[in-house]
Amino acid sequence: MTSTPTALSIAQDLLRCPSVTPADAGALDVLETLLKGAGFTVHRVTFSEPGTADIDNLYARIGNTSPHLCFAGHTDVVPPGDASAWTHGAFAGDVADGLLYGRGAVDMKGGIACAVAATLDYLAANGGQPKGSISFLITGDEEDVAVNGTVKLLQWAAERGEQFDHCIVGEPSNVETIGDTIKIGRRGSQSGVLIVDGVQGHVAYPHRAANPVPDIAKLITALNDEPLDHGSAQFQPSNLEFTSVDVGNPATNVIPAQARAKFNIRFNDHHTQETLKALVEHRLVAACGNRIRAHIEWLPSNADVFVTKPGAFTDLVGAAIAEVTRRTPELNTGGGTSDARFIAKYCQVVEFGLVGQTMHQIDERTPVSDLDKLTAIYRGVLERYFK
């Protein structure tokens, strides 16, 4: 039997493509060649949006029946930063002391490589066809604005009649070691700007002005005084975090006319975006009373909260993890947003990949042994899923 490529070799080929978002730099070509060679039907789809870069995406499928398991991910990466600070080139794909270095080694070219390697090995051992369908849904638009990637690729697939039963996103879900965490959900994210209007004037004549600075400080305190909630069965409490306060005033002798404070809320499944906004605005009105003039400008958001309830699918993935690592993974909903939020509208989805400790850092790296373990876990998922 001809041997299939290893996760390490695939990961190195991907890392050597400098696909800093929104550039593809040949990364999807690497995947297309491998998947076509294994019998997948591969589609390359480019999406556009005014004011954003055109993005190349890939959808590949083998099989045409249920059950249908999808592997999803992104080949774009964040910039490497100071190239001279890297021990090994950010796009060299070097291995040293058992570690694979490169931008995207963890987030998330390494995870994609493991999924592809596991799938090719599984197909080679099972007559080249699954007892159902396997697909890969890969975008080059996750690390930036995320408008021409997964969300549109899912819509495109649905219009073609594609139906997914379950999905694994290969994001670096583990905290410290392979097998410690499966992400089964993510909090929603909503940003806004609190704006307080005053009356500009000379500091020597405060009675002729209305200073918005003390008022915005009062409102920030008021909005943070009471928790938004106390958490839920699967989520930690929602959190409102102010991130900047600005008055745009370079002078020391002028009372500003307006003060603005930016904030972000990470919210759990007690809220929708609409009910969350209503709650915050209700508290703002109460804090303003009859004197302070303030309002909130809400920024657009496509980051809704989602959760995949523990059940047969999470048990299946957990069993594959336990077989390789002898660990029982924690089912977790912490962290930031990911493209899984879009996929959750189409099927049950979990995130499981490499260890995320060095993602987005100088010298991003992963142990080669972790690539081997993750490949074995994905292989175990496939065996169980199509049993």
Curated annotation (Swiss-Prot):
A biological process term (GO) from this entry = lysine biosynthetic process via diaminopimelate
Cofactor or coenzyme needed: Zn(2+); Co(2+)
EC annotation? Answer: 3.5.1.18
Q: Which domain of life is it from?
A: Bacteria
* Pfam families associated with the record: M20_dimer (PF07687), Peptidase_M20 (PF01546)
Question: Where along the sequence do coiled-coil regions lie?
Answer: none
* MF GO annotations: acetylornithine deacetylase activity; cobalt ion binding; succinyl-diaminopimelate desuccinylase activity; zinc ion binding
Question: What are the binding positions for Zn(2+) 2 in this chain?
Answer: 107, 143, 360
Catalytic activity, reaction form: N-succinyl-(2S,6S)-2,6-diaminopimelate + H2O = (2S,6S)-2,6-diaminopimelate + succinate
Q: Which residues form the active site?
A: 76, 142 (proton acceptor)
**Keyword vocabulary terms for this entry:** Amino-acid biosynthesis, Cobalt, Diaminopimelate biosynthesis, Hydrolase, Lysine biosynthesis, Metal-binding, Zinc
UniProt xrefs under InterPro entries: Bact_exopeptidase_dim_dom, DapE_proteobac, Peptidase_M20, Peptidase_M20_dimer, Peptidase_M20A
**Where is Zn(2+) 1 bound in this sequence?**
74, 107, 171
In which pathway does this enzyme or protein participate? Amino-acid biosynthesis; L-lysine biosynthesis via DAP pathway; LL-2,6-diaminopimelate from (S)-tetrahydrodipicolinate (succinylase route): step 3/3
Q: How is the cofactor bound?
A: Binds 2 Zn(2+) or Co(2+) ions per subunit.
Assembly mode: Homodimer.
Q: What is this protein's function?
A: Catalyzes the hydrolysis of N-succinyl-L,L-diaminopimelic acid (SDAP), forming succinate and LL-2,6-diaminopimelate (DAP), an intermediate involved in the bacterial biosynthesis of lysine and meso-diaminopimelic acid, an essential component of bacterial cell walls.
Family stated for the protein in its record: Belongs to the peptidase M20A family. DapE subfamily.
This chain belongs to the protein called Succinyl-diaminopimelate desuccinylase
Q: What organism does the record attribute this protein to?
A: Rhodopseudomonas palustris (strain ATCC BAA-98 / CGA009)
Tell me the lineage of the source organism: Bacteria, Pseudomonadati, Pseudomonadota, Alphaproteobacteria, Hyphomicrobiales
| Name of the gene | dapE
